[in-house]
Protein backbone atom coordinates (compact mmCIF):
# COMPACT_ATOMS: atom_id res chain seq x y z
CA UNK A 1 0.00 0.00 0.00
CA UNK A 2 2.54 2.59 -1.08
CA UNK A 3 1.50 6.16 -0.29
CA UNK A 4 3.48 9.38 -0.54
CA UNK A 5 2.51 11.93 2.12
CA UNK A 6 4.25 15.28 2.44
CA UNK A 7 4.14 17.86 5.22
CA UNK A 8 4.33 21.57 4.46
CA UNK A 9 4.19 24.82 6.37
CA UNK A 10 6.17 27.94 7.23
CA UNK A 11 9.01 28.08 9.73
CA UNK A 12 7.81 27.33 13.26
CA UNK A 13 4.81 25.25 12.17
CA UNK A 14 6.18 22.24 14.05
CA UNK A 15 6.51 19.85 11.11
CA UNK A 16 9.45 17.90 12.50
CA UNK A 17 7.79 17.30 15.89
CA UNK A 18 4.45 16.41 14.33
CA UNK A 19 5.99 13.97 11.85
CA UNK A 20 7.93 12.23 14.62
CA UNK A 21 4.88 11.66 16.79
CA UNK A 22 2.50 10.83 13.94
CA UNK A 23 4.95 8.36 12.40
CA UNK A 24 5.34 6.55 15.73
CA UNK A 25 1.58 6.01 15.88
CA UNK A 26 1.22 5.04 12.23
CA UNK A 27 4.10 2.55 12.52
CA UNK A 28 1.92 0.38 14.75
CA UNK A 29 -0.26 -0.41 11.71
CA UNK A 30 1.81 0.46 8.63
CA UNK A 31 5.31 0.20 7.18
CA UNK A 32 6.51 3.79 7.53
CA UNK A 33 9.53 5.66 6.16
CA UNK A 34 10.20 9.21 7.37
CA UNK A 35 12.50 11.59 5.55
CA UNK A 36 13.08 15.30 4.94
CA UNK A 37 13.98 17.93 2.39
CA UNK A 38 16.41 19.28 1.69
CA UNK A 39 18.27 16.15 2.76
CA UNK A 40 17.22 12.57 3.31
CA UNK A 41 20.27 11.04 1.62
CA UNK A 42 23.98 11.88 1.71
CA UNK A 43 24.19 13.99 -1.46
CA UNK A 44 21.05 15.89 -0.55
CA UNK A 45 22.28 16.50 3.00
CA UNK A 46 25.43 18.08 1.56
CA UNK A 47 23.28 20.36 -0.60
CA UNK A 48 21.20 21.16 2.51
CA UNK A 49 24.33 22.32 4.31
CA UNK A 50 25.27 24.62 1.42
CA UNK A 51 21.80 26.11 1.01
CA UNK A 52 20.75 26.53 4.64
CA UNK A 53 24.01 27.07 6.50
CA UNK A 54 26.06 28.99 3.94
CA UNK A 55 26.26 32.69 3.24
CA UNK A 56 23.82 34.53 0.98
CA UNK A 57 23.10 32.65 -2.25
CA UNK A 58 21.62 33.96 -5.50
CA UNK A 59 17.89 33.18 -5.45
CA UNK A 60 17.94 31.24 -8.72
CA UNK A 61 20.95 29.23 -7.56
CA UNK A 62 19.02 28.49 -4.36
CA UNK A 63 16.02 27.26 -6.35
CA UNK A 64 18.17 25.03 -8.57
CA UNK A 65 20.04 23.54 -5.60
CA UNK A 66 16.77 22.63 -3.89
CA UNK A 67 15.56 20.97 -7.12
CA UNK A 68 18.83 19.03 -7.50
CA UNK A 69 18.63 17.87 -3.90
CA UNK A 70 15.03 16.79 -4.47
CA UNK A 71 15.96 14.70 -7.50
CA UNK A 72 18.67 12.77 -5.64
CA UNK A 73 16.37 12.26 -2.69
CA UNK A 74 13.66 10.86 -4.96
CA UNK A 75 15.94 8.47 -6.80
CA UNK A 76 17.83 7.22 -3.76
CA UNK A 77 15.12 7.03 -1.12
CA UNK A 78 11.54 8.00 -1.95
CA UNK A 79 11.02 5.99 -5.14
CA UNK A 80 12.64 2.77 -3.77
CA UNK A 81 10.54 3.05 -0.60
CA UNK A 82 7.32 3.47 -2.58
CA UNK A 83 8.26 0.59 -4.86
CA UNK A 84 8.68 -1.54 -1.74
CA UNK A 85 5.10 -0.74 -0.74
CA UNK A 86 5.93 1.61 2.13
CA UNK A 87 4.19 4.78 3.28
CA UNK A 88 6.60 7.70 2.96
CA UNK A 89 6.22 10.72 5.24
CA UNK A 90 8.34 13.58 3.91
CA UNK A 91 9.10 16.85 5.70
CA UNK A 92 8.81 19.34 2.78
CA UNK A 93 8.72 18.69 -0.96
CA UNK A 94 7.96 20.62 -4.16
CA UNK A 95 5.39 22.93 -2.53
CA UNK A 96 8.11 24.42 -0.32
CA UNK A 97 10.01 25.50 -3.41
CA UNK A 98 6.88 27.03 -4.92
CA UNK A 99 6.08 28.99 -1.75
CA UNK A 100 9.62 30.01 -0.76
CA UNK A 101 11.52 30.50 -4.01
CA UNK A 102 8.60 30.90 -6.39
CA UNK A 103 6.48 33.32 -4.38
CA UNK A 104 8.41 34.75 -1.40
CA UNK A 105 11.69 35.17 -3.33
CA UNK A 106 9.77 36.50 -6.33
CA UNK A 107 11.12 34.14 -9.00
CA UNK A 108 7.59 33.13 -9.94
CA UNK A 109 5.59 30.03 -9.03
CA UNK A 110 5.25 29.03 -12.68
CA UNK A 111 9.02 29.23 -13.26
CA UNK A 112 9.93 27.28 -10.13
CA UNK A 113 7.24 24.70 -10.88
CA UNK A 114 8.75 24.06 -14.32
CA UNK A 115 12.19 23.58 -12.78
CA UNK A 116 10.88 21.16 -10.18
CA UNK A 117 8.66 19.22 -12.55
CA UNK A 118 11.84 18.30 -14.40
CA UNK A 119 13.28 17.08 -11.09
CA UNK A 120 10.30 15.08 -9.86
CA UNK A 121 9.27 13.69 -13.27
CA UNK A 122 5.59 13.49 -12.39
CA UNK A 123 5.91 12.15 -8.84
CA UNK A 124 3.56 14.38 -6.87
CA UNK A 125 2.40 13.49 -3.34
CA UNK A 126 -0.78 11.51 -2.85
CA UNK A 127 -1.59 13.70 0.15
CA UNK A 128 -0.10 16.89 1.58
CA UNK A 129 -0.66 18.00 5.17
CA UNK A 130 -0.33 21.77 5.49
CA UNK A 131 0.41 22.91 9.04
CA UNK A 132 -1.17 26.35 9.09
CA UNK A 133 0.49 28.68 11.62
CA UNK A 134 0.42 32.46 11.96
CA UNK A 135 3.73 34.08 11.00
CA UNK A 136 4.21 35.70 14.42
CA UNK A 137 3.45 32.49 16.34
CA UNK A 138 5.89 30.60 14.12
CA UNK A 139 8.52 33.28 14.64
CA UNK A 140 8.15 33.14 18.42
CA UNK A 141 8.48 29.35 18.38
CA UNK A 142 11.72 29.64 16.42
CA UNK A 143 13.11 32.13 18.94
CA UNK A 144 12.17 29.86 21.87
CA UNK A 145 13.52 26.74 20.17
CA UNK A 146 16.98 25.58 21.21
CA UNK A 147 17.94 24.46 17.71
CA UNK A 148 20.40 26.55 15.74
CA UNK A 149 18.66 28.86 13.29
CA UNK A 150 19.38 28.42 9.59
CA UNK A 151 19.45 31.07 6.89
CA UNK A 152 15.71 30.85 6.22
CA UNK A 153 14.83 31.02 9.92
CA UNK A 154 16.66 34.34 10.12
CA UNK A 155 14.68 36.02 7.35
CA UNK A 156 12.54 39.03 8.30
CA UNK A 157 8.90 38.63 9.36
CA UNK A 158 7.74 40.06 6.01
CA UNK A 159 9.45 37.19 4.18
CA UNK A 160 7.69 34.58 6.32
CA UNK A 161 4.37 36.31 5.72
CA UNK A 162 5.01 36.07 1.98
CA UNK A 163 5.81 32.37 2.36
CA UNK A 164 2.38 31.87 3.92
CA UNK A 165 0.77 33.83 1.07
CA UNK A 166 2.64 31.62 -1.37
CA UNK A 167 1.37 28.46 0.30
CA UNK A 168 -2.20 29.74 0.12
CA UNK A 169 -1.79 30.25 -3.62
CA UNK A 170 -0.34 26.75 -4.06
CA UNK A 171 -3.15 25.22 -2.00
CA UNK A 172 -5.84 27.06 -3.97
CA UNK A 173 -4.32 25.67 -7.18
CA UNK A 174 -4.19 22.08 -5.81
CA UNK A 175 -7.11 21.69 -3.36
CA UNK A 176 -7.56 17.99 -4.15
CA UNK A 177 -4.43 16.85 -2.31
CA UNK A 178 -4.14 19.30 0.59
CA UNK A 179 -5.49 18.96 4.12
CA UNK A 180 -5.07 22.04 6.32
CA UNK A 181 -4.38 21.56 10.03
CA UNK A 182 -4.47 24.52 12.42
CA UNK A 183 -0.94 24.47 13.84
CA UNK A 184 -1.51 27.42 16.18
CA UNK A 185 -2.85 24.88 18.68
CA UNK A 186 -0.86 22.73 21.12
CA UNK A 187 1.42 20.04 19.71
CA UNK A 188 -0.77 17.24 21.07
CA UNK A 189 -3.87 18.67 19.39
CA UNK A 190 -2.06 19.17 16.08
CA UNK A 191 -0.67 15.63 16.20
CA UNK A 192 -4.11 14.15 16.89
CA UNK A 193 -5.80 16.05 14.06
CA UNK A 194 -2.99 15.18 11.65
CA UNK A 195 -3.04 11.50 12.62
CA UNK A 196 -6.82 11.24 12.22
CA UNK A 197 -6.66 12.98 8.82
CA UNK A 198 -4.06 10.51 7.56
CA UNK A 199 -5.88 7.46 8.94
CA UNK A 200 -9.10 8.62 7.26
CA UNK A 201 -7.24 9.01 3.95
CA UNK A 202 -5.53 5.61 4.20
CA UNK A 203 -8.73 3.75 5.06
Swiss-Prot record:
Catalytic reactions of this protein: dTMP + ATP = dTDP + ADP
GO MF terms, alphabetically ordered: ATP binding; dTMP kinase activity
Record keywords: ATP-binding, Kinase, Nucleotide biosynthesis, Nucleotide-binding, Transferase
Example GO BP: dTTP biosynthetic process
Gene3D superfamilies reported for this sequence: P-loop containing nucleotide triphosphate hydrolases
Positions contributing to ATP binding: 9-16
EC numbers on record: 2.7.4.9
Entry GO CC: cytosol
PROSITE patterns, A to Z: THYMIDYLATE_KINASE
A Pfam family this chain is assigned to: Thymidylate_kin
Main function: Phosphorylation of dTMP to form dTDP in both de novo and salvage pathways of dTTP synthesis.
Family membership: Belongs to the thymidylate kinase family.
Name of the protein: Thymidylate kinase
Amino acid sequence: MSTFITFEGPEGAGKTSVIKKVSERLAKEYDIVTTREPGGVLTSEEIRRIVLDGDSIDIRTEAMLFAASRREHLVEKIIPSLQAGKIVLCDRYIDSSLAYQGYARGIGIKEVKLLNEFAINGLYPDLTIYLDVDAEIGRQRILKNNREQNRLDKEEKAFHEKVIEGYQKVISDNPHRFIKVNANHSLDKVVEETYQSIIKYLK
